[in-house]
Structures are given as structure tokens and as C-alpha cells.
Amino acid sequence: MDYDLIILGAGPAGYIAAEYAGKHKLKTLVIEKQYFGGVCLNVGCIPTKTLLKRAKIIDYLVHAKDYGITINGQAKLDWKQLLKQKQEVVDKLVAGVKTIIKGAKVESIEGEATVIDKNKVQVNNTTYTTNNIIVATGSRPRYLTLPGFEKAQQAGFIIDSTQALALEGVPKKFVVVGGGVIGVEFAFLFASLGSEVTIIQGVDRILEVCDSDVSELISKTLKNKGVQIITNAHVVRAENNQLFYTVNGVEQSVIGDKILVSIGRIANTECLDQLDLKRDHNNKIVLNEKLQTSTTNIYLIGDVNTQMMLAHYAYQQGRYAVDQILNQNQVKPAEKNKCPACIYTNPEVAFVGYSEMELQKEKIDYVKSSLPFIYSGKAIADHETNGFVKMMFNPKTGAILGGCIIASTASDIIAELALVMENNLTVFDIANSISPHPTMNEMVTDVCKKAIFDYFS
């Protein structure tokens, strides 16, 4: 065999798997079709957060008087400079990924790969043999195939999230189809940049994967920024920059200079089409608990297996899959219920474990403790009191079942809850820990102390 391992894709799952394999002396080849660093680094997590940080600064400037600051003169948005900074960040991190791969003594090739059989991969008209294959080919935006959509896409009116990060200017009117995580983040971004934003959502609230209290707070915040949210709306067609939809059977329309379609993502599994892998009734490739396909030397990790489309979940799967090949059992499998997730709105949303909605659906007994950030000295000092911390506990043992944080720094705080859940700590362990004061983090401790008084004393 030419290699011990061939990895298709150098995104978060693939390059971490490559690094781990290389450092464990596996002769490894990684093949990347387009982006070293994947969607996340090039046209996803990193560039959006770069722009959202600038949007947050704009929000601070708009509300400078609330902080006792008077600005003389007009602050102007330089969109081209923002895009330049975004690309500089991306380029720097892409270079870092390539350095990681090279440093692990892993070979790399640019090109589109196809798996010929369980031991052969073809790229750039050359076939390579291998003992193991890891597929980490990621995902792509899902499109709507409705009347007029293809024409509107070709004309540049209807765009996806990748195109939204490379617009020539800030659109006056920006329409978002889909009120999930990606759609809501872009709504915040362009509303802060000055666009008139409308969200078209198919169900009765945005962020439907979250509890209703989360959706309500973020909806209120968006509306305060001038964003119009239309729920229970079903998109039916497009005519250039005009989007038609129905609410309760009545057809309406909205005009947008740009219309972002953000309705989920599709796994890139085409490289496996020549194989007869076991699939379920939805044509999804079936995996076992070791992330192996029915051909057991072929693994699927990251977005392509659709388990949880998050970069940090992919990181863990990358290490875990290689660990299975090495038969070392040193890396724990990624557990969905202990993996945190973040939404980079302003304030941010972060959660881990069960939501209340999930606990109720699965009929799991729980008690809840929560506090708004108006109880936090640091939040008051920072003028950042919009949000709360809530946690759910096993009423008998005090085990933490889940938690949600809405705060200006929620994405930084949630790691504390994830670590606690990963190590099976309880409400008592957190309540007995000492948090620095004043910080936003101490609200987690305060919520646990409140829970003990309310339920466990």
C-alpha cells in the first residue's frame, strides 16, 4: 500500500485527523478539493465572526451616549476595508493549517478525489492505495428549487452564505430565507451594517432548535434593530429580486437587493458514489459507533456524516477516528449531548446538553434555576445586561442535564458548563467552586447556589 491512511478533506475534521495520524507515525496523505481549513475557516465560522466583531463595534458606536461617550464627527463604514481584514484573517489561519499538516509530516495534494474501492483513491488522474480512508469532505448550502429561483441566482439576487461574505457592498435591503443559526447571524450582521433586514421563517419562531425564551429574547433584540421577522411563511417563488411567500394561504412578497437562502446544508458524499455502502431510508450513509461505514476501513467524520455540523465536534471526531485506526482507545468519542454550541448574535447564545424543550419531549424529570444578567455586577458595569443563565438539573442527584447562556460573552462562558458536564460534576460541585469577581462567569455559580436553596436544601 502507498499509505496507511488517506484523508479526503482538510477542513476541521480532516486536518486535525491528519495531524493526529502524522504524529502517531501513520504514513498519511490528505487531499483537499478547494479550501485548506474547510468551509469553517474560509467561508464560515472565522470570516463571519470577523465581520460580526466589526458589527458589534458599530453597535457600540451607535449607542456611545449610553456609555457616557460623545463622538464628534461621523463614523463611516468602509466595507472594502472590512473585507480586506476578513481575508487577512482567513489567509493567516489557512497558512497555519498548512503548517500543521506539514509539521506532522503528512503529505498533501490539491484536487477532487474519488474513492474507487475500499483501498483505492483517485485524484488528478492518479490512483493511490491505502489501508484506511477517512472521508471529511464537509457540506454545502442547501438550495430551494422553486419557480424563478435559478434565474434569480444567476442574476445575483439570490445568494448563499458563501456569497454573502463577498458582496461588493452593503445591500440597502437584505432578505434572509430561514431563521436558523446562520440566517439569524447574517441578519444581525447586516442590520448593524445599515441594511433593512427581513427574515422569512417557515415556522412560528426563529431559532426553533432553542427554547422559546431564547427565541423571544433574540427576536426582541432583532426587532429593536429594525429587523422585520415574518413567521409561518412559506416561500413559493421568486421574480428577480422579489420573493413571494404565503402566510395562512395569503400570498405576499418582499423585495431585497440580496436574498440570502439559509435553510441548512447538504453532506458532500459524491466521492463515495462508486461504493456500495449501506444507507438508511433517507439515503444517508450508515455509521457505527466508531464512525465506520459498512466498509469498516472507511470512516466518515465532520459535517459529511451530518451528526452535528460544528467544527469543534469535527475536531473530536477527527482524533477519535484515527484513534480507532490505531486501536489505542485514548480519545473519547464525541457526544452530542455534551458538545456546546454557540450563536454569535449580540448578545451571544450558547448552550450545552438538553434544552427544556428536549427534556419535556423525552419526559425527563428536571428542575430549573435561572438568573438574568441584571443580577451581575460585571454585566451592569459593562452595560451588557441583556441575557440570562439557566440550568437544568436532575432533581434527585443534582446532575447537570443542560444549560443555556445569553450574554455578550456567552461563547466564552459555555466551555465551563461543557467541562462540568464532560466530567459528570453536579450542582454542588459548581456551587462550592470559587469564581472570580466581578465576571460574567460567576453567574453560573450563582445559578447553582440558587438551585441548591430552591431544590436541594
UniProtKB/Swiss-Prot annotation:
Catalytic residues identified in the record: H437 (proton acceptor)
Cofactor dependency: FAD
GO molecular function, one term: flavin adenine dinucleotide binding
EC assignment: 1.8.1.4
One GO-annotated biological process of the protein: pyruvate metabolic process
Catalytic activity entry: N(6)-[(R)-dihydrolipoyl]-L-lysyl-[protein] + NAD(+) = N(6)-[(R)-lipoyl]-L-lysyl-[protein] + NADH + H(+)
Keyword Cytoplasm: yes
Pfam families reported for this sequence: Pyr_redox_2, Pyr_redox_dim
Keywords recorded for this protein, A-Z: Cytoplasm, Disulfide bond, FAD, Flavoprotein, NAD, Oxidoreductase, Redox-active center
Positions contributing to NAD(+) binding: G178, G179, G180, V181, I182, V235, S262, I263, G264, R265
Record's cofactor remark: Binds 1 FAD per subunit.
Enzyme class, UniProt record, top EC level: oxidoreductase
PANTHER family: DIHYDROLIPOYL DEHYDROGENASE, DISULFIDE OXIDOREDUCTASE
Quaternary structure, from the entry: Homodimer.
Function: Lipoamide dehydrogenase is a component of the alpha-ketoacid dehydrogenase complexes.
Name of the protein in question: Dihydrolipoyl dehydrogenase
Organism: Mycoplasma genitalium (strain ATCC 33530 / DSM 19775 / NCTC 10195 / G37)
Gene: pdhD
